[in-house]
């Protein structure tokens, strides 16, 4: 709700909405919000009356993401520019002709205010539940991808179509010039899955056995999914204990290949679990 309120404030500042927003779940950083964002980026010294409200929203966006700008008055100064630059670098926005370092364009604002960021940005990695054949792997390579995430176990859909990676598929992926990273997800779509923290130990064991079976190299990171948006207290109460059990299992003698545990989920959840030192 806090993040959505930021998008709502942006829409009000842009003039996209002039009415009181009574349901934040209806707020979306869509085409209208994107089109109304200034063509000229927010930047150091850009402090006219038109930009002050937008600068202020960017300042709160920085704060929400852990980059305290030190002020919330809408004045874009060199300190704020430094925080924007650090945010852009950490979230992989630089070096792909998407942003100007230290300036807030619409892509940076999307990343500040939404978990998914700019969905139109280029990417080097993807994931899929489809068992890839040779042509599909080549298509991904030709589309500019270099890494593909694939699932170690499970099925998808009401017809339970297998989604787990196979040895033949690995050959197809590698022959196309792609690298593959393993994902474990046999649940995790809703909070109830995480309410018993020992589920983490069960999932850790299942993932390690599956990785060993198909020859995943020692030391590889296996990504465990949290596939829904959590409130902060839910992360503390349920997600952290779940990953604590994963971490404990991965650090035990049963992890003979010394695989590492990673996390795959919303930005805040990933950051919080990482801050606890439970994932690599």
Language-model-detected regions and their locations in the chain:
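Substrate-binding cleft of extracellular glycoside hydrolase catalytic domains
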Residues: 157-230
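Generic structural signal for well-ordered alpha-helices
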Residues: 137, 170, 204-208, 240-247
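Structural recognition of the beta-strand scaffold that forms the well-ordered cores
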Residues: 61, 123-127, 146-151, 179-184, ...
């Amino acid at each position: 709700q806090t993040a959505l309120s930021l998008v709502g404030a942006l829409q009000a500042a842009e003039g996209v909405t002039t009415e009181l927003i009574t349901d934040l779940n209806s707020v979306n950083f869509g085409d209208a919000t994107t089109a109304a964002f200034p063509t000229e980026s927010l930047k150091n010294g850009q402090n006219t009356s038109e930009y002050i409200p937008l600068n202020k929203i960017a300042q709160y966006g920085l704060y929400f993401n852990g980059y305290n700008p030190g002020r919330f008055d809408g004045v874009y100064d060199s300190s704020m520019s430094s925080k924007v630059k650090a945010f852009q670098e950490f979230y992989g926005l630089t070096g792909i002709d998407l942003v100007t370092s230290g300036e807030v364009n619409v892509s940076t604002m999307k990343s500040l205010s939404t978990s998914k960021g700019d969905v139109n940005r280029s990417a080097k990695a993807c994931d899929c539940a489809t068992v890839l054949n040779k042509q599909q792997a080549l298509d991904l390579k030709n589309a500019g991808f270099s890494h593909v995430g694939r699932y170690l176990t499970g099925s998808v859909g009401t017809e339970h179509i297998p989604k787990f990676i196979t040895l033949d598929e690995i050959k197809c992926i590698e022959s196309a010039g792609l690298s593959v990273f393993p994902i474990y997800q046999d649940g995790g779509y809703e909070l109830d899955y995480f309410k018993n923290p020992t589920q983490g130990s069960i999932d850790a064991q299942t993932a390690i056995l599956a990785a060993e079976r198909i020859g995943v190299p020692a030391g590889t990171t296996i990504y465990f999914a949290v596939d829904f948006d959590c409130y902060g207290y839910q992360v503390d109460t349920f997600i952290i204990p779940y990953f604590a059990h994963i971490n404990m299992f991965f650090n035990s003698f049963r992890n003979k290949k010394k695989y590492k545990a990673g996390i795959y989920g919303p930005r805040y959840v990933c950051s919080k679990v990482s801050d606890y030192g439970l994932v690599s």
